[in-house]
UniProtKB/Swiss-Prot annotation:
It comes from the Eukaryota. GO terms for cellular component: mitochondrial inner membrane. Its main location: mitochondrion. It is a multi-pass membrane protein. The chain crosses the membrane at residues 12-28, 91-107, 126-146, 184-200, 221-237, 284-301. Solcar repeats lie at residues 12-110, 120-206, 214-309. One of its GO terms (biological process) is transmembrane transport. This is Mitochondrial thiamine pyrophosphate carrier 1. Mitochondrial transporter that mediates uptake of thiamine pyrophosphate (ThPP) into mitochondria. Keywords: Membrane, Mitochondrion, Mitochondrion inner membrane, Repeat, Transmembrane, Transmembrane helix, Transport. Belongs to the mitochondrial carrier (TC 2.A.29) family.
């Protein structure tokens, strides 16, 4: 492995990076799927937990905290309810991982060619991370929207299958329906991924010397810290994205049937602030951070491990030849 922050930038062939990124996304998604469903349910809940009066007209469930929400879902929908939306999510995570790591590697290598105008290492990591995140988010956004809508379904199913959901959205909402909330997603993910990769590259070298870290390795620990700090800063846009993704003709058919009608990122933010206060923008933050830690640790550890295995396999194959 290369020293310092260069390890993600120039190690491995393009094929190895693509495969390692895809594997990392696949494994990470399956592990954190239950937390993702819980987070989405909490983000779409608009009534106040501290105000019983706001519960009077609620026809759906009232979720209170991560563990109780998980128990409610299992009791009402079965254990499989915690993996709702997992098929589009798995597809999204694999494609996202491939595009993200490939774009990050390509961008950093391109920036390295700017000898005269070379950016500082932290700035290079920020630019490459933001570029990779923006491209990956825009490219996989329809799958992200489908993941959210399936996770928001209760026992009354809005969509019966992945293909039927694609047909229904295309027929009833047009192709623009697949990109509801995309501006919030890109507005969130570009600074998020920039902050994530810059923090990750900065923390990994000093953490690499410690063997007994809580998450097992310097790669994993750096990934956890980078993800948690970046996600906290950008969380309001993530919540707005989820609220916008369930807009349209099926808005009142999901598990929470009282989701308001929102239009645009800024109008959504103003309406949430006016009706729910600043805390309304952070619903689901706790479970999101719980999810961020294992997701980032698993993603970065799986990526690094897969990349090393692929490199070792190539070396072994070349020796046989």
């Amino acid at each position: 492995m290369s020293a310092g922050g260069e390890h993600l930038k120039d190690e491995g062939t393009r094929r190895q990076v693509v495969l390692a990124g895809g594997i990392a996304g696949l494994v990470s998604r399956f592990c954190v799927a239950p937390l993702d469903v819980v987070k989405i349910r909490l983000q779409l809940q608009i009534h106040s937990l501290s105000d019983p009066i706001s519960h009077r007209d609620v026809t759906g469930p009232i979720y209170k905290g991560t563990l109780s929400t998980m128990r409610d879902i299992i009791r009402q929908e079965g254990i499989t309810g915690l993996w709702k939306g997992n098929i589009p999510a798995e597809l999204m995570y694999v494609c996202y991982g491939v595009i993200q790591f490939s774009a990050y590697r390509t961008t950093t290598q391109a920036l390295a060619q700017l000898d005269t105008y070379r950016l500082p290492p932290s700035a290079e990591s920020f630019v490459a991370g933001a570029t990779a995140g923006g491209l990956a988010t825009a490219s996989t956004y329809p799958l992200d929207l489908l993941r959210t809508r399936f996770a928001a379904q209760g026992t009354d199913r809005v969509y019966t299958s992945l293909m039927s959901s694609v047909r229904d959205i295309a027929r009833n909402e047009g192709y623009a329906g697949f990109f509801r909330g995309c501006s919030a997603a890109v507005g969130q993910i570009v600074p998020y991924m920039g902050l994530f990769f810059a923090t990750y590259e900065a923390l990994r070298p000093p953490l690499a010397q410690y063997q007994d870290l809580p998450f097992g390795s310097g790669d994993a620990a750096a990934g956890v810290i980078a993800s948690v700090s970046s996600k906290t800063v950008m969380f309001p846009l993530d919540l707005i994205r989820k609220r916008l993704q369930v807009q349209g003709p099926t808005r009142q058919l999901y598990i929470h049937r009282n989701i308001p009608e929102y239009q645009g990122v800024f109008n959504t933010m103003k309406l949430i602030l006016r009706t729910q206060g600043i805390r309304g923008l952070y619903r689901g933050l706790t479970v999101s951070l719980f999810k961020a830690a294992p997701a980032s640790a698993v993603t970065m550890w799986t990526y690094e491990t897969s990349l090393r295995l692929l490199q070792d396999m190539e070396v072994a194959t070349s020796k046989e030849d």
